[in-house]
Regions:
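N-terminal, charged low-complexity regulatory/assembly segments
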Residues: 1-44
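A sequence-level detector of short, solvent-exposed, charge-rich linear segments
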Residues: 12, 25-28, 62, 66, ...
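Short, flexible segments with low predicted structural confidence
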Residues: 15, 117-119, 140-141
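Glutamate identity and glutamate-enriched acidic tracts
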Residues: 16, 20-23, 54, 82, ...
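Amphipathic interaction/junction segments at domain boundaries or subunit interfaces
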Residues: 32-130
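C-terminal non-catalytic interaction appendages of large macromolecular assemblies
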Residues: 113, 124-125, 129-176
Length: 176
């Protein structure tokens, strides 16, 4: 009975979020919000309506981290070869041009890709829906996605989701 109620609440909440954000976001921002962010926020808030906040967060993290691990297989595969690393770097730097971030590339050559993000749609939407703890989950997901590549080392000291002024991404070529 609780599961049915959560699912019903989730669907209604997600539809409401879609209607709300479609008017506020650009088409590219809305596409990312719809496919990657709002589904997690709606899930979390729906579970939270039926259980304690920390339990809702634990369930949402478990679901999200499983999805990230599955998706990270392609990144890990790309990170096994020189060509894959080059393609990863080019694709990532291209993606940074989207209006879902405000970013500054500090270095992009065959040795490394280093950039800062000072505005992020994930953070903006988590703040909008008053769930900053979920933004930390999204930030932590980067470690699952990028933390175990053979030829590229991922480093980051700061994240917007943890209250810092920026997210500092650094991918450095390494020999293993």
């Amino acid at each position: 009975k609780t599961a049915d109620s959560i699912i019903k609440n989730y669907s209604a909440m997600l539809n409401e979020m879609h209607s709300e954000q479609e008017e506020l976001l650009s088409p590219s921002q809305f596409k990312l919000a719809k496919t990657r962010i709002l589904i997690r926020i709606a899930l979390y808030r729906s579970i939270k309506n039926h259980t304690k906040g920390e339990d809702a967060l634990a369930h949402t993290k478990k679901y999200f981290y499983a999805k990230v691990k599955a998706a990270s297989k392609l990144v890990k595969f790309a990170g096994k070869s020189e060509l894959g690393c080059t393609l990863f770097r080019k694709a990532f730097s291209y993606g940074l041009r989207a209006d879902t971030w405000i970013s500054a590339i500090k270095k992009n050559d065959k040795e490394s890709l280093v950039f800062d993000i000072t505005k992020c749609l994930y953070k903006d939407l988590c703040d909008f829906y008053k769930c900053p703890e979920l933004c930390m989950m999204f930030c932590d997901g980067d470690w699952l996605a990028f933390g175990d590549m053979e030829k590229l080392k991922f480093e980051r000291k700061y994240t917007l989701g943890y209250g810092d002024e920026l997210c500092d991404f650094k991918f450095t070529k390494q020999s293993r």
